[in-house]
Amino acid sequence: FIRPDVMYVFQRVLEGNGLLISEDGGRRVDANPWFRLIATANTCGQGDETGMYMGARPQSMATLDRFENWVSVDYMKPKKETAWLKGVVPMLSDDMASQMISYAGEHRVAFVDGKIMQPLSPRGLRAMAKRFVSTMTLVDNEANALAEAFGSTILDRCTSQDKVVLEGLYQRINK
């Protein structure tokens, strides 16, 4: 989320009063009727209690009150995420994309249930898929390429406790 001292500039705009530019003699710039200000935040402006989003900045309640609509966005549905993954990594086979999406779903459930501390974002999934495709040029089969991609993009960055859980999920899905 934005730095509070920068967000202050937008308070008048969010209240429908236009932008006041004090450096230009107090000139007021009215917003176009179709103007919208959209903000995204992993922490809903509350800061980060988990330590996972260290750059998250808590926002004042006065600032948060100026945003009238809040939308929670979940991960894509498996079918849509599979299509997306195939779109960003076209060399990925349908079966492998489906297998990776199944793993991602299980990984995310484990995260939500508090079994692991490491989430799996679409960026992380894309990294695993890209690593798999590039590794396929170096190894003799898909199983070895997938194990390498999983290890280097997922396992190598997580805690030892998470590794145990994630390796179990991986083994169950990739029998």
For the regions a language model picked out, list residue spans one by one.
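C-terminal regulatory/interaction module of P-loop NTP-utilizing enzymes
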Residues: 1-175
